[in-house]
Amino acid sequence: MRSRWSRSYIRVVNYHNTDKVDADRFEREIASFAEHFTSVSMEDIDRFFKTRKWDKDKPGLIPAVFEGFRNGYDVMLPILEKYGFKAWYYIPSFFMDIPVKEQLRFTEHYDLTVYRPEDYPDGRYAMTWDEVREVAKHHEICCHTGNHFQIGRETPDYDMYREIVVAKRVLEEKIGRPVDVFCWLYGEEYAYNPRAHKYLKEAGYRYVVSNLKIEKIG
């Protein structure tokens, strides 16, 4: 996200799968990020929107780890911790509660691509809630709907409520802290779906993320 207000900026790098086979590449990338950028916390975002300035010596960068996959914990988290670099984890909050034997079917139904199922022969592809809580100790937890569900202009209200409001409540109850950020599927902007905005406000989100920007919910 390039700042409209200064020459400083925040970049976002998306990770939708962090398979073991690519661990060396991920480490090289995070090591480079740690050298050339600074990580971004919610407090940094709050200050950025309040002051209209990025006040760090280095530009900001958010590694965005999507979908709540187990490899986001097993593979990516140790690398992030090694370099002390904060990531934002975008969690479809109902995924964690799907029984192990049904998780692959769930991923196929909701367009959560498992590229290397052989990495986890036990069939568990989602993080456990204990693992999500471990991630939450040093990283930001954001809501990516409940079921990895695309919310469109014609989506019924009960689906919007479940995927926006209930999904946030589940995350907050499980990790024991507020969840302030909602991320649309497939990068739609905040203005894409005005009908959904009342649910974002009702739920108490403060920011919404698209492929193009981070927007403050007014």
PLM segments and residue spans:
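C-terminal active-site subregion of NodB/CE4 polysaccharide deacetylases
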Residues: 1-64, 70, 156-218
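Short active-site segment of divalent metal-dependent hydrolases/proteases
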Residues: 69-70, 147
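Short alpha-helical segments and helix-capping/turn motifs at coil-helix boundaries
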Residues: 72-75
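A short, Lys/Arg-enriched amphipathic alpha-helix followed by its capping loop at the start of a domain
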Residues: 28-36, 79-83, 138
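Metal-dependent polysaccharide deacetylase catalytic core of the NodB/CE4 family, i.e.
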Residues: 13-16, 58-61, 81-190, 214
